[in-house]
């Protein structure tokens, strides 16, 4: 314990319960993970083909105390040694968020520790800070189940959304296409795996939208996949699921990557960060790395898989920055399911 308990060090506890992961973590100086615990509920939601909010909330209630205890044990620390507690206040499922927010408030109140509210997407972006120091100005491509956004940052804590989805998020489209292909939930990893065995030979649309727009649209693509499968079935034709997965993924990835590269050029950024659950997608990671040749001056940062999906280390990392900027939450902090960045 002694060797890393230098009092100049700052220890922040992060708590994340926005969807179907109950997570807590302790991060040192905003960069170094001391403890990181995630209890996933994926199996409970699998048979429903999506996250059931009521079930998610019940699981969070069951898990939160255990997860917090395990985190303190992993870190070999006492709560009194924490400098701050950071918690996801939104966006997400209101019942799920409430569990984390109330746990954080209870700990902060009982132990007189400063409390910081964190935006879930800011957390995903700051997961990269655990890998590499952020260099501004930067561009973050955030791709998850509920979000697909291009975010420009010229300094810490300032987020400018320069592009977002106009309908389905990429992760949502993956889940719906996976269902059409009779693949299990969540769809992303299954399509990613299947795509490697197929060829992108099916002609599917790519929504570029109007000139100069960094927005995304995936509902037309999703409908095209469903219609193509339906029409083939009507005609008694067989479409290889591998080829459909490869074709769908090629369409999504091409749009995501091209718009990211164009925005990075336009905004003259020093870094591109990949963030969110779909950032774990191998097709996306590979294509983005390939296209970086066009931007020799720009550094690409991709977090390890464990930091792409929901976790609390990213919330602690983002919370550290907010805490250092003097941001504090009061005991009136509440879950905000539609919180804007």
UniProtKB/Swiss-Prot annotation:
<feature type="binding site">
    <location>
        <position position="281"/>
    </location>
    <ligand>
        <name>substrate</name>
    </ligand>
</feature>
<protein>
    <recommendedName>
        <fullName>tRNA N6-adenosine threonylcarbamoyltransferase</fullName>
        <ecNumber>2.3.1.234</ecNumber>
    </recommendedName>
</protein>
<keyword id="KW-0808">Transferase</keyword>
<feature type="binding site">
    <location>
        <begin position="142"/>
        <end position="146"/>
    </location>
    <ligand>
        <name>substrate</name>
    </ligand>
</feature>
<dbReference type="InterPro" id="IPR017861">
    <property type="entry name" value="KAE1/TsaD"/>
</dbReference>
<feature type="binding site">
    <location>
        <position position="175"/>
    </location>
    <ligand>
        <name>substrate</name>
    </ligand>
</feature>
<feature type="binding site">
    <location>
        <position position="188"/>
    </location>
    <ligand>
        <name>substrate</name>
    </ligand>
</feature>
<keyword id="KW-0479">Metal-binding</keyword>
<feature type="binding site">
    <location>
        <position position="120"/>
    </location>
    <ligand>
        <name>Fe cation</name>
    </ligand>
</feature>
<keyword id="KW-0012">Acyltransferase</keyword>
<dbReference type="GO" id="GO:0002949">
    <property type="term" value="P:tRNA threonylcarbamoyladenosine modification"/>
</dbReference>
<dbReference type="GO" id="GO:0005737">
    <property type="term" value="C:cytoplasm"/>
</dbReference>
<dbReference type="InterPro" id="IPR000905">
    <property type="entry name" value="Gcp-like_dom"/>
</dbReference>
<dbReference type="GO" id="GO:0005506">
    <property type="term" value="F:iron ion binding"/>
</dbReference>
<comment type="function">
    <text>Required for the formation of a threonylcarbamoyl group on adenosine at position 37 (t(6)A37) in tRNAs that read codons beginning with adenine. Is involved in the transfer of the threonylcarbamoyl moiety of threonylcarbamoyl-AMP (TC-AMP) to the N6 group of A37, together with TsaE and TsaB. TsaD likely plays a direct catalytic role in this reaction.</text>
</comment>
<dbReference type="InterPro" id="IPR043129">
    <property type="entry name" value="ATPase_NBD"/>
</dbReference>
<feature type="binding site">
    <location>
        <position position="310"/>
    </location>
    <ligand>
        <name>Fe cation</name>
    </ligand>
</feature>
<keyword id="KW-0963">Cytoplasm</keyword>
<keyword id="KW-0819">tRNA processing</keyword>
<dbReference type="Pfam" id="PF00814">
    <property type="entry name" value="TsaD"/>
</dbReference>
<feature type="binding site">
    <location>
        <position position="192"/>
    </location>
    <ligand>
        <name>substrate</name>
    </ligand>
</feature>
<dbReference type="GO" id="GO:0061711">
    <property type="term" value="F:N(6)-L-threonylcarbamoyladenine synthase activity"/>
</dbReference>
<dbReference type="InterPro" id="IPR022450">
    <property type="entry name" value="TsaD"/>
</dbReference>
<keyword id="KW-0408">Iron</keyword>
<feature type="binding site">
    <location>
        <position position="124"/>
    </location>
    <ligand>
        <name>Fe cation</name>
    </ligand>
</feature>
<comment type="similarity">
    <text>Belongs to the KAE1 / TsaD family.</text>
</comment>
<dbReference type="InterPro" id="IPR017860">
    <property type="entry name" value="Peptidase_M22_CS"/>
</dbReference>
């Amino acid at each position: 314990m002694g060797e890393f308990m230098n009092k100049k060090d700052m220890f922040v506890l992060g708590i994340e319960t926005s969807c179907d992961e109950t997570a807590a973590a302790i991060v040192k100086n905003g960069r170094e993970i001391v403890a990181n615990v995630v209890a996933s509920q994926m199996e409970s939601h699998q048979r429903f083909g999506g996250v059931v909010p009521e079930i998610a909330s019940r699981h969070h209630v069951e898990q939160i105390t255990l997860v917090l205890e395990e985190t303190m044990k992993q870190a070999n620390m006492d709560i009194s040694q924490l400098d701050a507690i950071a918690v996801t206040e939104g966006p997400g499922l209101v019942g799920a968020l409430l569990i984390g927010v109330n746990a954080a408030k209870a700990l902060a109140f009982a132990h007189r520790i400063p409390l910081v509210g964190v935006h879930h997407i800011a957390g995903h972006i700051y997961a990269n800070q655990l890998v590499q120091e952020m260099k501004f100005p930067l561009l973050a491509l955030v791709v998850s189940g509920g979000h697909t956004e291009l975010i420009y940052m010229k300094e810490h804590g300032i987020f400018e959304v320069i592009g977002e989805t106009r309908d389905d998020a990429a992760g949502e489209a993956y889940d719906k296409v996976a269902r059409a292909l009779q693949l299990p939930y969540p769809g992303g990893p299954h399509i990613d795996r299947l795509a490697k065995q197929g060829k992108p030979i099916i002609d599917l649309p790519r929504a570029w939208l109007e000139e100069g727009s960094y927005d995304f649209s995936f509902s037309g693509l999703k409908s095209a996949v469903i219609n193509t499968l339906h029409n083939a079935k009507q005609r008694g034709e067989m479409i290889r699921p591998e080829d459909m997965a490869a074709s769908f993924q090629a369409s999504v990835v091409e749009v995501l990557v091209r718009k990211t590269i164009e925005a990075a050029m336009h905004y003259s950024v020093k870094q591109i960060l990949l963030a969110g659950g779909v950032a774990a997608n191998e097709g996306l990671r590979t294509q983005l790395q390939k296209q970086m040749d066009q931007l020799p001056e720009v550094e690409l940062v991709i977090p390890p898989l464990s930091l792409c999906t929901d976790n609390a280390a990213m919330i602690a990392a983002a919370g550290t920055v907010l805490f250092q900027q003097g941001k504090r939450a009061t005991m009136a902090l509440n879950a905000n399911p539609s919180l804007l960045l």
